[in-house]
Amino acid sequence: DSSTSRGLGDVYKRQSVQSYEEFAKPDLQKASREEIVELLLKSGLWPMIVQRPYGVIADPNDTPKAVFISAFDSAPLAPDYNYVLRAEQKNLQTGIDVMRKLTSGKVHLSVRAKAEGQMTALKGAETHAFAGKHPVGNVGVQIHHIDPVNKGEVVWTVNIQDLAIIGRLFNEGRVDMTKIIAVAGSEIEKPQYCRIIAGAKVDSILKGNVKPQKEGDHVRIISG
């Protein structure tokens, strides 16, 4: 969102030391589909892959006709993925390489029309440009326009931030759930981007950044 401050000083950084379980990093060029699936299951990242229709966790025994990824979010106050993922080019590329191993068809990557940034430079995916207002960034809308799901077919989708986390697993051999989110809305004193670890306490992100409320006022905090 254009109203969200992008200063590096605005990014919340978790100070505690993190420890990680180490996983063997497979050679993607040589690894079998079964090895890829096994690592995603063992690491706990498999639920990031969602099946359409029905919007349920993908069945690892299925082979989808395609994988769809939306590289932008058209919802109000949504983060600018070109900004929050600006340091994740390598992980995004590896994530796409992983997705290619999981489908017998194509990996479809949807970007904003005339968008600048790194998304269009990613290789191994068929890129589609979309223009218009929300919900044009929703992957379901994009599937409908690119390659609709017919009776008996399944496709898989993965959120672009989750794709970077999957790529990070295959590049670094660990599950690092760090991501950047947008903190914004009418009751936020200073809209900003925050670097967090998934599962962070909401009060640690919002502390001191919610406008003073009058007695009887209620502030609703929404994630998503």
Where does each model-flagged region fall?
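Buried, small/hydrophobic-residue-enriched core segments of structured protein domains
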Residues: 3-5, 9-224
